[in-house]
Amino acid sequence: MEIESAATSGESFTSVTSKKSRKRRAAEERPMDMGEQPSKRPDFPPISGDKLMGDKDEMRKIPVPSHRYTPLKENWMKIFTPIVEHLQLQVRFNLKSRNVEIKTCKETTDVGALTKAADFVRAFILGFQVEDALALVRLDDLFLESFEVTDVKPLKGDHLSRAIGRIAGKGGKTKFTIENVTKTRIVLADSKIHIMGSFQNIKMARTAICNLILGSPPSKVYGNIRAVASRAADRF
């Protein structure tokens, strides 16, 4: 037999190593040089505020209607202080164009500071108290929404006046109730309605106001918004 003759002759099988195993063994035997190996993740150093804002200074202009000149003058320091000290922006009231002008500078570090300041001033111009409008600077999830009574229902004359009266209530009771339950702030300026709050809260307040405009009695509206508010509280 051939197999028996090969075994008796003392011949043995030769092991063959593949190219991959040879390369792997050579890589393991080679000393590790940590300095030459590139890092797996790119390392980007933080950008300074002035580079992030760019070379050009940005500016926002907020027009001021004539009936808000006096309140703006009386509350100027309350508006000026948080914009300059907290947001590191420049602000002035242009007497010629009747605009509040807000501008970035070298000290400005926050990219969204200009938008926050513009929303803060715009909220005050719309009729919100300075203390309430200041929440737009401190918190990120607050928004402004404006609409007119005629957007919900085309009313005129006495019908429009009655709809506005239903929203306000006797001595402002209805408006205050909606504000407290939905945790929003509401301003009634003639037929315009301005709401400030978080997205969900604005939605609840808007639904309640629309129901009042469409003719729902206040007691029914109170019950609906309280039920929605309690469901939202349970959800979170």
Swiss-Prot record:
Q: List the disulfide bonds.
A: none
Q: Where's it found, cell-wise?
A: Nucleus, Nucleolus
Residue ranges, compositional bias (Polar residues): 1-17
The molecular function terms of the Gene Ontology recorded here are: RNA binding
Identify one Pfam family in the record.
KH_KRR1_1st
Q: Which residues form the KH domain?
A: 152-209
| Keyword NADP (UniProt) | no
Grouped into one coarse class, the protein's main location is nucleus
Q: Which keywords, in A-to-Z order, does the entry hold? A: Nucleus, RNA-binding
* Composition bias type Basic and acidic residues, residue spans: 26-43, 52-61
Which GO CC annotations does the UniProt entry carry? nucleolus; nucleus; small-subunit processome
Q: Where is this region: Disordered?
A: 1-65
Q: Which GO terms describe its biological process?
A: ribosomal small subunit biogenesis
Report the superkingdom from the record: Eukaryota
Q: How does it assemble?
A: Part of the small subunit (SSU) processome, composed of more than 70 proteins and the RNA chaperone small nucleolar RNA (snoRNA) U3.
Record function comment: Part of the small subunit (SSU) processome, first precursor of the small eukaryotic ribosomal subunit. During the assembly of the SSU processome in the nucleolus, many ribosome biogenesis factors, an RNA chaperone and ribosomal proteins associate with the nascent pre-rRNA and work in concert to generate RNA folding, modifications, rearrangements and cleavage as well as targeted degradation of pre-ribosomal RNA by the RNA exosome. Positively regulates dimethylation of two adjacent adenosines in the loop of a conserved hairpin near the 3'-end of 18S rRNA.
Name the family.
Belongs to the PNO1 family.
Q: What is this protein called?
A: RNA-binding protein PNO1
Please name the taxonomic classification of the source. Eukaryota, Metazoa, Chordata, Craniata, Vertebrata
